[in-house]
Every structure is written in structure tokens, then in C-alpha cells.
Amino acid sequence: AKDDFNEEIDYMGATLSVSGTGVFASSLSRYFDRVLELMAGSVLEPLLTQEEFERQRDLLKENLKTADKDVATAADRVENLLTYGAKHPNGEFISQESIDKITLNDVKDYFENYSKSTNAFLVIIGDVEFEDIKTKVTSLFNGWEAGEVIASSYPTPTNPEKSEIIFVDMPNATQSVVSIINTIDFNKKESDFFAALVANRILGGGGSGRLFNNLREDKGWTYGSYSGINESYKTKGVVIAQAQVRNEVTDSSAVELLKEIDKMRNTLVTDEEMQNAKAKYTGNFVLSLENASTVASFARNIITQDLTEDYYNTFLSNIDKVSKEDVQKASQKYFQTNTTRIFITGKGSEILESLENIDYNGEKLTVRYFDNFGNETARPDYSVDESVSAASIINNYIDAIGGADKLESVSSIE
């Protein structure tokens, strides 16, 4: 039973989690054999019951009710949809309707089609001997069915021919989410991979990045502004520069993000920025090695992404080799301002007019309008009906509760 399973895991102080693409387990060495046995059971014979399916489905739907009203969640949803496309897995999002369409049989079919030993890698890190663990794994996973897994195909994401503003109206927003995103061909095997990492660190990879120093330290428009460069071995990666800002500085923030990106493209970074970025990568990399799951992910990446055996052994030396010229070339290749999407999610009645007047590099940017589920719409109309006044609102309310006579009959309020 599921409760017995969870209780035993808790008793051992272990962790065992299952997702749609894999299983992760962690435990003390003395409980390793039993945890490995439970892990094998969850892979080979998962407990897929109607009762648990309905419980998880209802929980997911309840969480969505809150998320649907969240500005940051809406921003992420539309950003992913328009960046990757509706038919790309990274562009899909969960909705009440999509959850209702799923049945337990769909879940079982997914498991049968994709959970194959020929499509799996098992990485074990810890105080173990190879021959001993090989014997145990062979015994426990011996019954795992092999078979071909059919890979899905989907359209290749593209950037717009000219930069455009994607506006998402959220009337309840007290802040705006501004994100500049473009897709890139980028993975760990790229010759300029390490230069791009350093470039991103300098642009907005932390509290010492240019975006943070500009929008937070200098102007005080946000609690933080950051950038990211995300690789993908199988599909397109993305570059993103982002900030959550006050409504009244939304347009100015978008322009400042674009300026900082162009500055990375057009000028060399400083010696101090190079030194700080490399030092930060060195510190983070060394600290990450203390986490066994990080070491396991390194081993998995070497196998699944066709990396050289010494890829992570030479990681820091490759970071150290990056020059200022390398950073500028990588910035020119991956950071874009002319063919990018500028996503702005916020309160249109306060920010839209200024967004429609943004002029960058001598050209006014086109604005497209979307709802919070990524459906393109007409421009929102914020004009107020002339017949509506404070007096009419009060009178309509009085009529709704029964009229003036009923209101005058109220003698006390508790």
C-alpha cells in the first residue's frame, strides 16, 4: 500500500521521489539495499490506482485555481507558449480543461510506452563497490521490459523577424513582469559554451550583474533583475533577461534591459567583471561537488549528451581560458535585441499607453495583445462609460439590496 511505502521511507530517513521521466532516491548507506529494492519496485510495478489518480488530479486542479490569478505564473505560461509554440512540449501548459481530459488509462499507456530499460540510465553515487552493486541492480531490475521508445517530433521554435512587445493584461497586477526572450542553438558541446556562461554571469547572473546594478542598485525599480542562458541538447535553448518592476517604470525598465543587452554586444567587459565572474563560477562549482546528486547529474550528462569523459574535470580550466573578446563574440551570437520578444505582463490600464510609445534604436516597437492563457486579443479598452459615475454605482447597489426604503429601515448594524 502507498501509505506503508511512504511510512517505511520516512522511517529510514530516506528520500524516494518518482516523476514522469525518472526516479530519484537517497539514503544512508545502511539502508541502501532496501531503498534500492523499493526504487526498483516503483519502476517495475508502480501503484497506479483510480483512487490515487483522482486524488492527485483534484489536488492539481485546486492548485491551479490559485495559480491562474498569479501574475508571475501567467507571465511564465504565455512566455513559454509563444517562445516555443503550442505544439512544442516546452510550450504546453496545464489547464483545468486539459486535466479533465486525462484518464487513468492515459497514465498507464504513458508508463507502458515510455518506461523501458532500453531508454533508461541508472546512476549510483556513494560508498559502493561496482561489482557488488552491479549484481544487486541486475537482480532487482532483471524483469524490466526492453523495447523501442518512439521519440516525439515537434516544430522548431523561431524568433520573430523584428522585435515586438507581447503584452499580457492582468488587471490585478501591482507590479509588471518584464522578460526579454530569444531562442538559441546552445548546448554543452558548443565551442563558445563557456564564453556564453561568463557573458551571462556578467550581464545578470547574480547580485553583481549589470542588470541588478542598473535596475536595483542605481534606479531602485525592482528587488532584483537577472538573466539566464539555458542550454538544450535536443531542442532550442533560450536567453532571458527579466525583472519585476513597479507599474510606473515598466516601459523604462524594458528599455534599460535592452540597453544592457546591447552593451554586452557592442563593448568589451572590464577586467574586474571577468575576474569576478570566473571566481563566482569556481566557487559555485567546487561547492556543488559536495552534493552527491550533482555528481550523479554530471555522470548522466556525459552519457546522455555525448560529452567527453573529462568534460567536468576540465570545466574550471575552460572557464579560466575565456577572454573578454570571447565574451563579446558570444554575446553577439546569443544575446539579441533586434529579433526578440519583449514580454510584459501587468496592469494595462496603468502601463499600456506608455508601452505603445516605446522607441528603441529609432524605431517604435510593435505591440501585440494577449490574454493570460496566450490567446491573441484586440487591444484592451480602458475607456469608462460616460453614464457610469460614483452616484450611479451607489444607486445601482441600493437597488440591488432592495431599494432606498429597505436601506432606511435599517436601525442598527452589528
Segments predicted by a language model, with ranges:
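C-terminal regions of mature proteins
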Residues: 121-126, 156, 275-388
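N-terminal leader/targeting segments and the immediate start of mature chains
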Residues: 378-414
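Scaffold signal of the M16-like zinc-metallopeptidase fold and its non-catalytic homologs
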Residues: 35, 42, 67-117, 137, ...
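An aromatic/glycine/proline-enriched structural segment found at the starts
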Residues: 121-186, 346, 353-380
